[in-house]
């Protein structure tokens, strides 16, 4: 079992129960899934760009990404409905905890001028969205093989009802929030 999951079960559940006065263990919020999304705007002109993005996303997540397609045609972007324009991965279970641990311990500290992540990126329902400017912060990505620096969105979906509960859960899991 992943050590982050073990820590959640052993320490975090009891600490959150004390802090928020839950009656049952089932009320305690937990991380449900992590969605990593990479929008590839270049894919309209250059189909090879999407292939490299899919390859990088599969290296980062350890799982095959799903290709996302355009919902509408937009003439200004030379975009037709159904064209592939990005890739996303949904992580659950063991892979989710492994990715979260890697993100907190290895990847986020590698960001240049890193002073912690914003406390304001919660959506009001207890989900946290994090934007990453470059994929090079992940140790699996080889700098020499990168054709273009791309960012990605990482959404951490929790079962908590309020942002305060989710913030406490993520902070105890080791997310480095700004002071």
UniProtKB/Swiss-Prot annotation:
Keywords: Ribonucleoprotein, Ribosomal protein, RNA-binding, rRNA-binding, tRNA-binding. GO terms for cellular component: ribonucleoprotein complex; ribosome. One of its GO terms (molecular function) is rRNA binding. InterPro entries: Ribosomal_uL5 (IPR002132), Ribosomal_uL5_bac-type (IPR020930), Ribosomal_uL5_C (IPR031309), Ribosomal_uL5_CS (IPR020929), Ribosomal_uL5_dom_sf (IPR022803), Ribosomal_uL5_N (IPR031310). Gene3D superfamilies: 3.30.1440.10. It comes from the Bacteria. GO terms for biological process: translation. Part of the 50S ribosomal subunit; part of the 5S rRNA/L5/L18/L25 subcomplex. Contacts the 5S rRNA and the P site tRNA. Forms a bridge to the 30S subunit in the 70S ribosome. This is one of the proteins that bind and probably mediate the attachment of the 5S RNA into the large ribosomal subunit, where it forms part of the central protuberance. In the 70S ribosome it contacts protein S13 of the 30S subunit (bridge B1b), connecting the 2 subunits; this bridge is implicated in subunit movement. Contacts the P site tRNA; the 5S rRNA and some of its associated proteins might help stabilize positioning of ribosome-bound tRNAs. Belongs to the universal ribosomal protein uL5 family. This is Large ribosomal subunit protein uL5.
